[in-house]
């Protein structure tokens, strides 16, 4: 049920509610006049409220009808716009499908033409070969021709580019520029065509600049990759050389290292030079062993000769096996000291000393022990 039908039912119900009230008032008019008066006042107040409610309801209904009308208008406009959009989309899809079909047909046509061209070239080559064979049979000469060797036969394209002279490069540059740079031909063009020509040139400049930037970035990236790969290869070669017991820079040089001979029994890498190995086969093992023994004995002799030489105590007496530079014994020192003064004196005669008593002998022994300890301490201090 629509809103209009509901509203019409409410309008019909309102007067139905008011009729019994009037009938009640008519029935009660026969009673107390004051009561009747109050009832009339109440009925009039209710009628006014009802009228206000009806007026408010009609305003609200008119507003809702207006909003509903606006919504219906928007809906109809949206339907029209959607239909137009669907129509445009269908047209665009149709054009896209036609373009795709046309491209497929053009590609097929190009493939057919390319195949026909290859077949024609193959047929021409075959006919030329047959003609050459016929001429050869007629001439009855050698079936081959020796051509002069091109100097750039075994050279790569990069080597050929590097070996080109300056004049050749200039000539190639002129030829390439003549293909790329075309004449403008703007003599008989009006303003609109000149604008179109300017936009075309601007687009070409933008395209060339973008290609230039892309190539520069690609070159930077490739240079970085090459540096990284070279460094990685260098590190791997260093580790490989260290594993083989070689110098870390042995494998990174211009020439490869010499072949290392591994011991069959010890499973060790032989790091000796070629000359050392050659001496082994020439009977140099004895010389090597003698040289090593001489080095050992020489080092021991140097340690013995450079030892610290201490002075002997006076009670030691004469040193046996005295050599040049060794400290003299106490007797020799006293003899040298007295030699300069008492050379002309006669040798004195001494009387035998009396035998000492036991107490004196013990005291002398203690004194001698103390002197020995003092001399040992002095020698230790001198050595330090």
Swiss-Prot record:
Key words, A-Z: Muscle protein
Record GO terms (molecular function): tropomyosin binding
Biased composition (Basic and acidic residues): 61-74, 81-126, 316-327
Annotated Acidic residues bias: 1-15, 328-384
GO CC list: troponin complex
Protein's GO biological process: muscle contraction; regulation of muscle contraction; sarcomere organization
Residues covered by region (Disordered): 1-23, 61-169, 237-257, 313-384
Family according to the record: Belongs to the troponin T family.
Protein task: Troponin T is the tropomyosin-binding subunit of troponin, the thin filament regulatory complex which confers calcium-sensitivity to striated muscle actomyosin ATPase activity.
Identification of the protein by name: Troponin T
Organism: Periplaneta americana (American cockroach)
Upper lineage: Eukaryota, Metazoa, Ecdysozoa, Arthropoda, Hexapoda
Gene: TNT
């Amino acid at each position: 049920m629509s809103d209009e039908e509901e509203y019409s039912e409410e309008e019909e119900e309102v007067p139905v509610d008011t009729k019994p009230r009037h009938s009640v008032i008519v029935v009660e008019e026969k009673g107390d006049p004051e009561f009747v008066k109050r009832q009339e006042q109440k009925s009039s107040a209710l009628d006014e409220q009802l009228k206000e409610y009806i007026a408010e309801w009609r305003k609200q209904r008119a507003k809702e009808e207006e909003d509903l009308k606006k919504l219906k208008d928007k809906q109809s406009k949206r339907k029209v716009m959607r239909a137009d959009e669907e129509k445009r989309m269908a047209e665009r899809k149709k054009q896209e499908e036609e373009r795709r079909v046309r491209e497929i047909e053009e590609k097929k046509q190009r493939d057919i033409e390319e195949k026909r061209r290859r077949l024609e070239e193959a047929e021409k080559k075959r006919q030329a070969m047959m003609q050459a064979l016929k001429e050869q049979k007629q001439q009855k000469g050698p079936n081959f021709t020796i051509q002069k060797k091109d100097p750039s036969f075994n050279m790569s394209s990069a080597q050929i580019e590097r070996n080109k002279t300056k004049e050749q490069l200039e000539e190639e540059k002129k030829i390439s520029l003549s293909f790329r740079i075309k004449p403008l031909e703007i003599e008989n063009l009006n303003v609109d065509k000149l604008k179109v020509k300017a936009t075309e040139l601007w687009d070409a400049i933008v395209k060339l600049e973008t290609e230039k930037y892309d190539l520069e970035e690609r070159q930077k990236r490739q240079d970085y990759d090459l540096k990284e790969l070279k460094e990685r290869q260098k590190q791997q070669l260093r580790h490989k050389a260290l594993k083989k017991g070689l110098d870390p820079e042995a494998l990174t040089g211009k020439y490869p290292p010499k072949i290392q001979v591994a011991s069959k029994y010890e499973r060790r890498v032989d790091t000796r030079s070629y000359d050392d190995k050659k001496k082994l086969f020439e009977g140099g093992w004895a010389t090597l062993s003698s040289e090593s023994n001489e080095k050992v004995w020489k080092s021991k002799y140097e340690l013995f000769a450079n030892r610290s030489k201490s002075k002997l105590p006076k009670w030691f007496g004469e040193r046996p096996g005295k050599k040049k530079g060794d400290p003299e014994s106490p007797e020799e020192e006293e003899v040298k000291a007295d030699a300069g003064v008492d050379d002309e004196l006669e040798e004195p005669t001494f009387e035998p000393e009396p035998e000492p008593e036991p107490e004196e002998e013990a005291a002398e022994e203690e004194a001698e022990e103390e002197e020995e300890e003092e001399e040992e301490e002095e020698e230790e201090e001198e050595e330090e």
